[in-house]
Swiss-Prot record:
Compartment list: Nucleus
Organism the protein comes from: Ajellomyces capsulatus (strain NAm1 / WU24)
Taxon lineage: Eukaryota, Fungi, Dikarya, Ascomycota, Pezizomycotina
Cited function: Transcription factor which regulates nonfermentable carbon utilization. Activator of gluconeogenetic genes.
Biased composition regions of type Gly residues, renumbered to the chain: 657-669
Positions with biased composition (Low complexity): 142-155, 218-229, 670-714
Name recorded for this polypeptide: Transcription activator of gluconeogenesis HCAG_03671
Family to which the UniProt record says this protein belongs: Belongs to the ERT1/acuK family.
Amino acid sequence: MTASTQNGSPTPPPAAPTATNQESKNMTANPADASESQSPANEKGGGTAENGQKHTSTAANAKDPLRPRRKKAKRACFACQRAHLTCGDERPCQRCIKRGLQDACHDGVRKKAKYLHDAPNEALMPGIRRNFYNQANATRTNASQQQNGPNSNSNKDSRQNVAANFYSPQSASNFDVYTQAKSQQGQGHIPPTVMQDTSINPSAFQAPSPTSTPNFDLSSNPPNRNLSSAMTQTPSSASNQTQDPFGAAFFDPSHPALFNFDIASMNFGNRYGALEFGMLGHMATGAGDTPPSDSATQRGSIGRSSGTFTAQNFGDSTNTQPPFLFGDPVLNDWNPSGQSQTNPRNNNIYNQNTVAGQMGEQHPNAFAIESAPMNFASPGSTESPQMTTMNQFDEANAKFSSRTALMHQTNPHQPPPISTPGLKHQGFQVGVKRRYRSPSSIYESVKEPYSYTSGFHNLTAFIQRRFSPQKTLQIAKALASIRPSFIATTKTLNQDDLIFMEKCFQRTLWEYEDFINACGTPTIVCRRTGEIAAVGKEFSILTGWKKEVLLGKEPNLNVNTGGSSPRGSGTFTPRNGNGVDPHSGMSASGGGGGRTQPVFLAELLDDDSVIEFYEDFAKLAFGDSRGSVMTTCKLLKYKTKEDSAALFQGREAQQGGPDGKGGGGGGGDVATTAATTSTSTSNGANSSGHANANRNNTNPNNSSPPSSSSAAAAGPLHGAQLSPKQTWGKRGIAGEAGMNQLGFRDGKVECSYCWTVKRDVFDIPMLIVMNFLPCI
């Protein structure tokens, strides 16, 4: 046998008897190679007879341009890959059929790429639709192969056994539910043992890791049956089912069938990379957040509930089985434990015990993407996962049942697909909704510029009243260094420019408000004059300052100024003389105008922090536009005169009792006295710890009875925690109650804070954004 014959070249065997005898011996020794060597020759000879062309022996070789060429397959089978021959996309391929190896024809294993070394072998399977045996291709292949005569019987056997022999036969035993269901389909019922099989029993889902999903062997191929036909009670529907279009993993959340991924059309060499690419695209498109068109929904842009998997995909469905694989409640009509389906708490595959076991005694576990609806979102550590999840399941099951009943009444065989806009009205809340305010309202509402001149005048007057002459001079020097720059940048601006500047400020503030609401860090935003323009809820909890007070919508009754230095005027006496701060909703600086005044940033910091801030602000205002400052400061707690009186009374009650119990008893007496006086409404819901005053600022002569502010200060949360000797550890600071106790002894909260300056289109400092974190 010549070398060309061994390599499968189309050169016909020589006519010499000796060569024929030698070839016959080789064929007897290796019949597979003999059939291979004859197949190209027969194929070439057939082509020559049909085209009516005659070729010489020199032209009938592999380099012949007229030789019909095979289309290169995306992945060769194992036999063709080992022989380095051209294979086809069909399974079994033509070469294996001619060699009689159709039973062992399967995809070859490629060498892993470096970035896939950590991927399991089961995840590197090729595309599902590409590798399943196509009936139409099988019919065409059978018609083209009938000319070969002896190969027709092998083709018939290959068509019958292709589904069972595509993967290893040993792995087919993992899915016991299908074998049991197949044996009972002819009888029209399914025994209860099928429903209690371990392959679909929720008790088999051990959840080894927070992000784990039910373990299904992707390397196995179940029998050619449909899930819906296996679970139905009519044998007629089971006989009409076609081949399963979704392969083996019916319950695997990472399976591409759950998202309508067409892996074969992605031109990936392996399933692992294609699935990762498709999942990233599914996440990036935000399915369920933005309502796409119905046509896009039918193509695969489905929402979180995966509602487009209807009975049209899975065959006929009876009234006892809704036409959804993964509905809003996860598989709520599967009842593996055999219990009654009237209890909505037990109608899902993740029953109450499973959910409680996964999320009960540990931190809230995460779930794989799209493995469950948004009802499985991780709750807070202080909530009860069992109660939260089950309440959400009750609501979801009720709505799902009503929708399923309506679909069965209209058309149980072809229910209409549920579009993503319809899912948004099912009661699924995804995060906090964006406020309905439109940016267009900002441009329509701003009609006049903001008076920064009066703001700086008010700031100067406040600094002169609060600080000593030496500290006032330090702040004045810092502001004087940037005053020429402000004058130079604003002297060319007209009225329209100033209005546009205010519109830019309001529009930027509109964006920052969303950021503040989404971020859990205590944050404030103020103008370049230091006036507070926006504040987060966490800042109010930390310092006790209400948002309405900071923004100038309510009177500012704070008397806590830190008390670290004597004031410039000797005493902090307001101009109106009635004990009300000038910035308490009255006219600015005691003058006319009737404009409410927001709180200045200097009112929130102690003396040293204010001086340090303005020195840094002078360097950063017209310096580095992307720069920021990170340092420490002391925030002043909000305290009124009534809070000071309540704290003073608590200290007097403390002195009469033992050290170990005096603090708690005194605090309790204050709480009782304050509670009998009025309700805690003055200082807001987030500022219930306002009895955290500095003892240096406490006026012993002031014996006014506690008002509503003192009631808030000595409420039930903090009535027994007013002892100045009490210390707080890291474990004691938890929730709003713990944050309110920070700085309750001296009225100061030591914080680390970072702030930056944002400029407008005229390169003028527009606003200051500050983030605080308490030092515990």
